[in-house]
Amino acid sequence: MFELSTIYAAFERYFGKPPTRIARAPGRVNLIGEHTDYNDGFVFPMALDRATYVAARPRDDRIVRVFSVKFRDEDQFDLDHIVRDTQRQWVNYIRGVAKGLLARDLPLRGADLLIDSDVPSGSGLSSSAALEVAVGYTFQLLNQINLLGEELALLAQGAEHSFVGVKCGIMDQLIAALGEAGHALLIDCRDLSYRPIPIPTGVRVVVCDSGVRHRLAGSEYNQRRAGCEEAVRILRPALGKIQALRDVRSTDLAEYGHLLPPELLPLVRHVVSENERTLAAADALAAGDVVKMGQLMVESHQSLRDDYCVSIAELDTLVDLALAAPGCYGSRMTGGGFGGSTVSLVEAEKVDEFVAAMIAGYAIRTGRTLQPLVCTAGAGVSCVYASEEE
């Protein structure tokens, strides 16, 4: 459990004065619906009870000073001259959010920020979006700005596009802003509408970090997004006014898939089938059919492995181990891929046996130490401390 007193004291030690606000934004795990968000599709994430925290105090000038506890590093920039840092990626998330707020002609003053987090970095649990949303919300608190959750999510996404260089979809930022405790959200990434669906009390969501770190800013992620966009251009003359792969159905692909070059067909097949699986999974979980939900998770992993080619050996091993472990309904890789984590749906009464089996099995198969996280669906971004001092 993250202690607010720890970040409060750290801020006071570092900056010499106490913070006036502390905000938090959660990491997330996506139950199903992978690489669909930037195709205007459907996703089914839940916010975690692990989060990024920002302690803050306003300044009387235009300078923003930042200290990251996790990176043991600091940054300073002027709100009137915000540029990308070519050496340190973590600072660009913060600079990009500030730049985005200013681009909307919103009033900002300088601030001292101290950041800490218990969301593992690089594990596919969206630590980056948690940072962006937490920082954006902190600037709102300090400057009396009122943005809707959807607006905050779009602002954070824009920061990642322009300042970090990852053309991510909207899912990670949206669930960080709008998550509901005890629920997963079925999100339509085209119009940003969503439907909360309760997590059944008899199951647990378990995340297993492969220990392999990924770099989404690398070429693989952006190449796949570009491939999906190219496929839309190729299919549009045959299918009419389609805007994204979200508008393509399995029947369309069966009829017109021959128009696609061999390297694009598997990408499209994954996105189209994953959208259909995600809608079916949300209905299954809403009905309490965890067996069906688990089957769809397994199919999702197979598609990500074989068609989208974003899984790796360690993720495949974790899924294989999970499906053989006690109480597991289904398992899949989660996040962008090339490393990161798996997510498993597990019978609550057998979760301890499941965790023990995963730890032992992964050590035997890979020599790595596994630390499974039994997760609770948490709430979205919020202010967790406010002093009377302004």
Curated annotation (Swiss-Prot):
Keywords: ATP-binding, Carbohydrate metabolism, Cytoplasm, Galactose metabolism, Kinase, Magnesium, Metal-binding, Nucleotide-binding, Transferase. Mg(2+) binds at S128, E160. The active site is at D172. Its main location: cytoplasm. Disulfide bonds: none annotated. The record marks R28 as: Transition state stabilizer. One of its GO terms (biological process) is galactose metabolic process. One of its GO terms (cellular component) is cytosol. One of its GO terms (molecular function) is ATP binding. Substrate binds at E34, H35, T36, D37, Y221. ATP binds at S68, G122, S123, G124, L125, S126, S127, S128. Its EC number is 2.7.1.6. It is found in: Cytoplasm. The keyword Transferase applies. It catalyses: alpha-D-galactose + ATP = alpha-D-galactose 1-phosphate + ADP + H(+). Belongs to the GHMP kinase family. GalK subfamily. Catalyzes the transfer of the gamma-phosphate of ATP to D-galactose to form alpha-D-galactose-1-phosphate (Gal-1-P). This is Galactokinase. It comes from Chloroflexus aggregans (strain MD-66 / DSM 9485). The gene is galK.
